[in-house]
Amino acid sequence: HHKLLEKVLPRLRDLLSKYEGVELSEMLMSIAQASEAAADMDILMTLVPEIESRYSEVSLVHSVNNVWALTQLRMRHPRLLQRVADDLRHPTKAKDLTPGYMARIAWVYRRCDAWDMVSETMLPLIRSSAAEFRCGDFARLAQVLPQEQTLLRQIADLLHITLDEMGRKDFLLFFLGCVHGELLEPVASDQDGRGPLTEACLNYAREEQDNFKRDEVQKIIYMLHHSPKYKGLVGALPASWSATKEETLDFIQAKG
């Protein structure tokens, strides 16, 4: 294996030098998303320096994808993280970032323990785009920035308005974001004492209870059960979910 690599890697390096920066970025993304992503480190060690040397050839979006792919592969690349952080401070480069990319950036820098590098730039950007956030972006943001309560509440309040039109998948993501961001307050055992957002989510579950798939119901139960703050809401879920609820809670208990 080692002797073969000694022959192959210089040729690979030579081949990679002929590709465009965007194509190299796409290769890295493919490696990160491959199911057997115990990606060959030798190939990555050849590909990543090439990507770094072509940094200025690609857009900020591709550079974000590069650090995202490396983070997926559990690789922290300080120089690339710094260069992306520097570019994010550049108003013209950062102006076209979508909420999806903003959430992706937050995920990358939190996972790499480097949120301080970008927080001053990203928080105002996210705030000014709050109205454009969809449920999936909101859920990802709430998972990585649960401490940014004011910001998350701003997005949740805007999404709350569209709750009646949400499909189940979007509702699950919205609910996940509300649970992670601890936005469902107050939570009382009786209906009258609950906050409007809490009651609206429970009401959605009641109205759509027959349309939820079993695995979706299980996700809601898992989510609430594992949240110290909202564990009590499991009892407020629709009665028709009781059998699934009991099975799921038994399974959680058995797993210990």
State each model region's role.
Residues 1-256:
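Eukaryotic RNA-binding helical-repeat scaffolds
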